[in-house]
Design a protein with these regions (language model features):
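Active-site mouth loops of central-metabolism enzymes
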Residues: 10-25, 79-86, 159-169
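Glycine-enriched alpha-helix->loop->beta-strand junction motifs that scaffold or abut catalytic
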Residues: 68-71, 100-102, 179-186
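Flexible, glycine-rich active-site loops centered on histidine and acidic residues
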Residues: 2-5, 9-20, 83-145, 185, ...
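A conserved active-site cap/scaffold subdomain adjacent to cofactor or substrate pockets
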Residues: 173-196
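N-terminal beta1-alpha1-beta2 module of alpha/beta enzyme domains
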Residues: 1-68
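Hydrophobic faces of well-ordered beta-strands that scaffold small-molecule active sites
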Residues: 6-10, 42-44, 74-77, 104-108, ...
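Aromatic/hydrophobic pocket-lining residues that form the small-molecule binding cavity
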Residues: 23, 27, 58, 89, ...
Length: 197
């Protein structure tokens, strides 16, 4: 049993009778407990326009959690790439990796994590992110790559940073993309369990 590496995902829910700050405090308290139990990873989700969740500013919650834990890896489960410019994601996670070396994970999803009106408000450029997801994953890899392989636009301080990237998904397309480009693939087990019933 000691060889099994355990991880957790937190959507940062606001429980009945709680305020936003209470949910964030609970998020940190859980992370600290899991850190003490030698969990390997603690990931925080990204959701927008969800009144019962406080996980819209994922990178800020990751930083806050890293500041209050010692060794557990903290990351996104995941950053919904259609909502963000890859340059900004690389800059944010490059900064996190600079502040907390070898403790940051970058999980990426291709869904917007919200309804279409909110997704449109997040990316006003009429971005078609679901279909551009593979190219945007490649852009992220470029931004984290070695300085001698960078283009004119560079994502400082992400250059030369080794931030592990994971693809989150439930399809073979996502699995193939992960096999070609990133460290790992995470599949939501509920999809498998419901399919087998």
């Amino acid at each position: 049993m000691k060889n099994i590496k355990l991880s957790a995902l937190n959507l940062v829910p606001i429980r009945e009778g709680q305020e936003d700050k209470d949910a964030i405090n609970d998020m940190v308290t859980l992370a600290q407990a899991l850190d003490d139990l030698d969990y390997e990873r603690y990931w925080i989700a990204e959701h927008h326009n969800a009144p019962n969740l406080v996980s819209s500013a994922t990178s800020l919650l990751i930083q806050h959690t890293l500041e209050h834990t010692h060794s557990i890896k903290v990351g996104s489960g995941g950053i919904m790439l259609p909502n963000h410019a890859p340059l900004v994601v690389a800059e944010q996670f490059g900064t996190l990796e600079t502040l907390f070396p070898q403790r940051v994970d970058l999980g990426l999803g291709r869904a917007p994590g919200t309804d279409m009106m909110t997704a449109s408000a997040l990316r006003r450029d009429q971005h078609n992110g679901v279909y551009q997801f593979p190219e945007e994953v490649e852009q992220l890899q470029q931004y984290f790559g070695p300085s001698h392989q960078q283009a004119y636009v560079r994502a400082y301080p992400a250059v030369d940073k080794n931030v592990p990237m994971y693809i989150l998904g439930s399809s073979t397309d996502s699995a193939h993309l992960a096999a070609r480009h990133v460290k790992g693939y995470h599949m939501f087990l509920q999809d498998i369990l419901l399919h087998n019933k």
